[in-house]
A protein has these predicted regions:
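Glycan-recognition and catalytic cores of secretory/periplasmic carbohydrate-active enzymes
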Residues: 1-481
Length: 481
């Protein structure tokens, strides 16, 4: 990996520019769509080139490598590029755009959330301010006026972000934007972003999400269609959009500590993201329809999973998300621990009054029982443990108005603390045990998983007269029918 980072460093220009397609002249080859899509010179077609998108992924890689190894060479390369972009886009550089600030939001969002990660890694507020500025100017300084992939809504540039109320356009672009907005809201305290985020989230779960957590049902734009247009066989549901759905909802949870966001993220993770990769880890789905047969080459011209794609964002996106999941298992404040995803884990959480060792044993999502062992540093400590009670234990599988169980029976969950039944009422989707904990204390949460039949709202034409089978957080597939 170090040799690859050295190569990246050698490819970077002295001023910080780092987009090899222009540096090497590959962008001049207009026989390929990618060449035309890059523009004829750096930053000349921001609306559709992937210069800032690629740099955002590079920042995330640099931060991840630094976190894993402590080596900062790649991080320094990323910082040099970020300062270059700030100079060119918001100050002006004689070598680019005639010396005028480009002052345009990228056509494919990603750099916004990546800049926030760069801020977390370095503490430099320049990167947080850049993220906010890219969000603030979207739909303000530039709006395309074409159709399809050049329409204003395709890259969420039809309105300033604070005026947007519905999920539109390319689903991956959209979820990356919403993730960046949630990051900026949380880190800057800019609550003017909250109404738009709340409205967009509600619009997604009420009208535009498949029961698998898949987003972006429409081919062509790879994105959101009209409300309730959720076909099964023709669904697009790009794997990257499901990754974006997980990221957006996790960030909304971190901002609001409401379990409904994790409930959506969990459904998307188990039923769409993981469906996008084979058990062997080397074959992939780009698209994830809910219905197919052995004859339909639905997966970018392939009938089943493919070892690779010409545009290989989905395999690399799975490799990007899966290593992040352990870091999403728990969240904490000074005196609170939130258990978000359930899986066998062992961790140490640094609360204000001392560290807490926490282990979790479970066969979830197939097994119904989750067991915790809690051991505060020093032998005892007072804090609150918040355990998620998933939406699927109630009268519907996933938050939103779209889907409900055929039958109103609830799965009665049970909480035991050191073998004694705990009495608590969930608040914002969490049941809370607040007490002075001692080393070796045990908590057991039982989440019954009966097989359930689900129905969609009648507005979803493709699902009329149909039922979907779920158990726990999993959607089940009928094969060879």
């Amino acid at each position: 990996m170090d040799s690859i980072i050295d190569l990246i460093g050698r490819a970077q220009q002295d001023d910080g520019y780092l987009y090899e397609a222009h540096t090497t002249g590959v962008s001049a080859n207009h026989e390929h769509w990618g060449g035309a899509g890059m523009g004829d010179r750096p930053y000349s077609w921001v609306v559709h080139s992937h210069e800032l998108y690629n740099m955002g992924h590079m920042y995330e890689g640099a931060v991840a490598y630094w976190q894993a190894t402590g080596k900062d060479k790649w991080l320094r390369i990323a910082e040099k590029n970020a300062r270059h972009i700030n100079h060119v886009f918001f100050e002006g550089d004689p070598a680019y755009n005639g010396g005028k600030p480009v002052n345009q939001a990228p056509g494919h969002e990603e750099i916004e959330l990546a800049l926030v990660k760069l801020f977390h890694a370095t503490g430099d507020t320049l990167y947080l301010n850049m993220a906010k500025r890219f969000i603030d100017i979207r739909g303000v300084t530039y709006r395309p006026d074409g159709d399809g992939v050049m329409s204003p809504s395709y890259a969420q540039q039809h309105l300033p972000v604070r005026q947007q109320t519905k999920a539109v356009g390319h689903a991956v672009r959209a979820t990356y934007l919403y993730s960046g907005m949630a990051d900026v809201m949380a880190q800057t305290g800019d609550t003017t972003l909250r109404p738009a985020l709340d409205s967009i989230w509600t619009n997604i779960v009420d009208t535009r999400m498949h029961i698998t957590g898949g987003l972006g049902a429409v081919h062509g734009i790879e994105g959101f269609g009209p409300e309730y247009l959720l076909p099964n066989k023709e669904a697009y549901n790009e794997t990257c959009a499901a990754v974006g759905n997980v990221m957006f909802n996790y960030r909304m949870f971190m901002a609001e500590k409401d379990a409904r966001y994790i409930d959506v993220a969990e459904v998307a993770l188990y039923n769409n993201v993981l469906a996008g990769v084979s058990l062997s880890g080397n074959r992939f789905f780009y698209v994830n329809p809910l219905e197919t047969d052995s004859r339909q080459a639905f997966n970018q011209g392939v009938k089943g999973r493919s070892p690779w794609f010409g545009t290989a964002c989905c395999p690399s996106n799975i490799a990007r998300l899966i290593p992040q999941i352990p870091g999403m298992m728990y969240a904490y404040t000074d005196d609170d621990i939130y258990c978000t995803f359930y899986a066998g884990t062992s961790t140490v959480i640094p609360l204000k009054k001392g560290k807490v060792s926490l282990s979790q044993q479970t066969e979830y999502p197939f097994g119904e029982t989750i067991r915790f062992e809690i051991s505060p540093e020093g032998g005892s400590g007072r804090f609150a443990l918040h355990l998620r009670i998933p939406t699927w234990t109630g009268t519907q599988f996933v938050p939103g108005r779209l889907y409900s169980y055929a039958g109103d029976s609830r799965a009665a969950w049970q909480l035991l603390v050191n073998g004694e039944e705990g009495k608590a009422v969930p608040e914002k989707g969490f049941v809370t045990v607040s007490r002075t904990w001692k080393r070796g204390d045990r908590v057991e949460l039982r989440l019954p998983m009966p097989v359930r039949f689900n129905r969609a709202l009648p507005q979803v034409e493709a699902d009329r007269g149909r039922l979907c089978v779920t158990r726990g957080p999993l959607v089940y597939c009928a094969e060879a029918v």
